[in-house]
């Protein structure tokens, strides 16, 4: 997902979700 919101917790940056 290119426009994946932080709420979706993108697999590209799982650490960014926290």
Swiss-Prot record:
Q: Which UniProt keywords apply?
A: Antimicrobial, Hypotensive agent, Secreted
Q: Name one GO cellular component term.
A: extracellular region
Is Repeat one of the keywords?
no
Bilayer-spanning residue ranges: none
Set out the biological process GO terms recorded for this chain's protein: regulation of blood pressure
The listed locations are: Secreted
> Quick one: where is this thing mainly located?
secreted
Tell me yes or no: is Transmembrane among this UniProt entry's keywords. no
Q: In which tissues is it expressed?
A: Expressed by the venom gland.
What does the protein in this record do? Antimicrobial peptide. May also inhibit angiotensin-converting enzyme (ACE) and potentiate bradykinin (BK).
UniProt lists the family membership as follows:
Belongs to the non-disulfide-bridged peptide (NDBP) superfamily. Long chain multifunctional peptide (group 2) family.
Protein's name in the database = Probable bradykinin-potentiating peptide
Q: What organism is this sequence from?
A: Tityus metuendus (Scorpion)
